[in-house]
């Protein structure tokens, strides 16, 4: 049997995509709308406390197009904690007007090969660089791009039948492209084998949305993607600060 890749795992991730039911929201009187927005604000304040004590992260982006209107991206140290956030959010009054359109579950991962390289001889989980990758601080970048992907298992193009050494070389070459965008694009890779419909969820952040187009285009021509990758839907959006929510929901 071929050797399976080993990974280091960090925070669990939930991408929760919602569509605003504008027709139903418009029927509410302004007083009820304000009460619901205040309740949402208190919820987000509690999320900020969790973030400040280093036990999780979260961000909100406004999504373009008709796949969704919003994405709530939450990271926690366990599936139980992630589920608690999800359930609490769904119990908010405003959640009745935020219709689920898509979701994705993953866990931030780093290949054992890369983690060992970064950590040198020390325990990777104690290395600051490795920990920053596994338990990332989400950057307040203007734009987000999310997409799920898998590796092919199709005849001669079966990623999982390649020898470990060949896979490592392809990933190293692929990674060189990503590193060339350092300072322009920050990425978080979530492993989702056994968690969701694809094998990874990729989240990109940038202040220039065109960088998403550039990096994805360049990677498409790399063999690891051109020959072995399959992609799901792409979602792109703009940063939505908590204090901007009231303006968004004002009719």
From Swiss-Prot:
Enumerate the UniProt keywords alphabetically.
Heme, Heme biosynthesis, Iron, Metal-binding, Oxidoreductase
User: Which catalytic reaction applies to this protein?
Assistant: Fe-coproporphyrin III + 2 H2O2 + 2 H(+) = heme b + 2 CO2 + 4 H2O; Fe-coproporphyrin III + H2O2 + H(+) = harderoheme III + CO2 + 2 H2O; harderoheme III + H2O2 + H(+) = heme b + CO2 + 2 H2O
Pathway(s): Porphyrin-containing compound metabolism; protoheme biosynthesis
Q: Which domain of life is it from?
A: Bacteria
Q: What's a single GO BP term from this record? A: heme B biosynthetic process
Q: Name one GO molecular function term.
A: oxidoreductase activity, acting on the CH-CH group of donors, oxygen as acceptor
Query: What Pfam families does the record tag this protein with?
Result: Chlor_dismutase (PF06778)
InterPro entries tied to this protein: CHDC, ChdC/CLD, Dimeric_a/b-barrel
Q: Which cofactor does it need?
A: Fe-coproporphyrin III
Q: Does the keyword Nucleotidyltransferase apply?
A: no
The UniProt note on the cofactor reads as follows: Fe-coproporphyrin III acts both as a substrate and a redox cofactor.
**Active site, per annotation:** 147
Binding site residues for Fe-coproporphyrin III: 133, 147-151, 174, 187, 225
User: SUPFAM superfamilies annotated for this entry?
Assistant: Dimeric alpha+beta barrel (SSF54909)
Q: Which Enzyme Commission number(s) are on file for it?
A: 1.3.98.5
Role noted for this protein: Involved in coproporphyrin-dependent heme b biosynthesis. Catalyzes the decarboxylation of Fe-coproporphyrin III (coproheme) to heme b (protoheme IX), the last step of the pathway. The reaction occurs in a stepwise manner with a three-propionate intermediate.
Q: Which family does it belong to?
A: Belongs to the ChdC family. Type 1 subfamily.
The name this protein goes by in its record:
Coproheme decarboxylase
Q: State the species of origin.
A: Listeria monocytogenes serotype 4a (strain HCC23)
From the UniProt record, report the name of the gene that encodes this protein. chdC
């Amino acid at each position: 049997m071929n050797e399976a890749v080993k990974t280091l795992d960090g925070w669990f991730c939930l991408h929760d995509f919602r569509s605003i039911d504008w027709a139903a929201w418009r029927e509410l009187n302004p007083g009820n709308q304000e009460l619901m927005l205040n309740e949402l604000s208190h919820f987000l304040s509690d999320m900020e406390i969790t973030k400040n004590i280093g036990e999780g992260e979260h961000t909100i982006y406004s999504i373009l197009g008709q796949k969704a209107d919003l994405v709530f991206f939450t990271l926690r140290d366990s599936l139980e904690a992630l589920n608690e956030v999800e359930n609490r959010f769904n119990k908010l009054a405003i959640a009745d007007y935020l219709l689920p359109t898509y979701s994705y579950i993953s866990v931030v991962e780093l290949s054992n090969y890369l983690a060992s390289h970064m950590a040198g001889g020390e325990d990777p989980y104690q290395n600051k660089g490795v920990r920053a990758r596994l338990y990332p601080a989400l950057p307040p970048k203007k734009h987000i791009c999310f997409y799920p992907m898998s590796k092919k298992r199709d005849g001669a193009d079966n990623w999982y039948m390649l020898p470990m050494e060949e896979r490592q070389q392809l990933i190293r070459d692929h990674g060189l492209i990503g590193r060339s965008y350092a300072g322009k694009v920050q990425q978080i890779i979530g492993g989702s084998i056994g968690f969701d419909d694809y094998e990874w969820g990729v989240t990109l952040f940038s202040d220039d949305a065109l960088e998403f187009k550039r990096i994805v285009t360049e990677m498409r021509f790399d063999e690891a993607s051109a020959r072995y990758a399959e992609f799901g839907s792409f979602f792109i959006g703009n940063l939505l600060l908590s204090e901007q929510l009231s303006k968004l929901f004002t009719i």
